[in-house]
């Protein structure tokens, strides 16, 4: 598929087909594509936590997302939670001090580049995605046992669209 077509095809999906599953291999393909994005000094501090079983997805939705996003990702057969290790990207290794005023902003920047690669690869594979930033960080951290050394940024629902997005 032409790159321009992928860019134009990608849409936020809020209506997933619950009858179509996404394989572990497809999720691994998305994460591999994400990891090819540029990052500060190639430090690759982004982390991906995947919720793939239907019962765990339902439990995660109920415990970690507000009602609006519970509805928005209903039927999605995969959730990918994206984080990055704080205090590394944009920081001097020797002193631990930020190299400029952006500080951990560079970690957000790198993860944003990687998340875009992930969702564009999903579009190429005819998968739909929805990036959700409204979520309960402490509930996610507890549910997935994410260490305090990582900043939780987004939850990405992945699945097949139930209808063609407009």
What do the PLM-derived regions correspond to, one by one?
Residues 11, 55, 135-138:
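Alpha-helix/helix-capping structural signal
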Residues 69-80, 145-166:
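A glycine-rich helix N-cap at a beta->alpha junction
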Residues 30, 34-35, 80, 95, ...:
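Small-aliphatic-rich amphipathic alpha-helix that forms the alpha element of a beta-alpha
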Residues 26, 42-112:
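Glycine/small-residue-rich phosphate/adenosyl-binding loop
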Residues 3-13, 18-21, 88, 154-166:
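C-terminal helix-cap and adjacent tail motif
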Residues 43-46, 124-127, 153:
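Short secondary-structure junction motifs
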Residues 13-37:
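An N-terminal domain-cap segment
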Residues 84, 134, 160:
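Short secondary-structure boundary segments
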């Amino acid at each position: 598929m032409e790159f321009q077509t992928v860019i134009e095809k990608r849409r936020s999906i809020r209506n997933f087909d619950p009858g179509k599953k996404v394989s572990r291999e497809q999720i691994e393909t998305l994460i591999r594509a994400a990891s090819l994005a540029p990052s500060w000094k190639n430090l690759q501090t982004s982390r991906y936590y995947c919720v793939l079983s239907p019962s765990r997805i339902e439990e995660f939705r109920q415990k970690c997302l507000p009602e609006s996003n519970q509805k928005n990702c209903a039927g999605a057969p995969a959730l990918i939670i994206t984080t990055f290790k704080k205090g590394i990207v944009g920081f001097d290794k020797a002193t631990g001090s930020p190299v400029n005023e952006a500080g951990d902003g560079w970690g957000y920047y790198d993860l944003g580049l990687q998340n875009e690669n992930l969702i564009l690869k999903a579009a190429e594979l005819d998968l739909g995605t929805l990036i959700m930033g409204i979520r309960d960080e402490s509930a996610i951290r507890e549910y997935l046992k994410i260490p305090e050394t990582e900043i939780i940024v987004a939850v990405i629902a992945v699945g097949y669209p139930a209808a063609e997005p407009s």
